Amino acid sequence: MMAEKPENSLEKETGRLEAFSDGVFAVAITLLVIDLKVPTLKGPVTSQQLAEQLFSQWPSYVAFLISFATILIMWVNHHNMFKLVHKSDTTFLFANGFLLLLVTAVPFPTALVSEYLTSSAAVIACVVYCGLFAIINIAYNLLWWSAVNHHLLKPNVSHFIIRARTRSYLLGFPSYLLALVIAFWSPFVSITICALLWIFWSIASYEKTPMRLHQQDE
């Protein structure tokens, strides 16, 4: 029987953890759709009435799209991070669990924004929304920190990519904190910043700096 390649054996050690994480991301992103409700109108309903009711629910659509895109990008970044990791330890497992805990909470502030974005309570709804994503960014940095400082990365990952990833992950917290502060004056601007951030992260995920992995001897 042919000997198993070292790369394959390294990947198997984190395979279960990544599969479990993928399942949590999938559930969280699916739960977002629950807040999209079909309008209930009594009596004979005209197309105009239905259209007006559908349009009046625009905060729900905005919150759904932003949250869906954000969770999707979080999953992409999580997947990209695990491409660099070849083993785990207890700290890494708990850091990943903390991140997943926060990811499953995303539908709650999304529902708050959907319900109260056009009301006088919009400030609190947006503060909670931005605050959660700021904490999620802290969780991402903890996960990355544990991978780097506990020597869980693949041996051929260069210092260049480590520094590039670290800078990228550190950008999130001050950005969401800024959106949180702005929410006290303009909830709509705050939500706009969140939308711009997921656009930025999606572009950044495509423009990742080359990994510059050194080829291992076969």
Model-assigned labels for residue ranges:
Residues M2-E218:
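Multi-pass alpha-helical transmembrane bundle typical of ion/small-solute transporters
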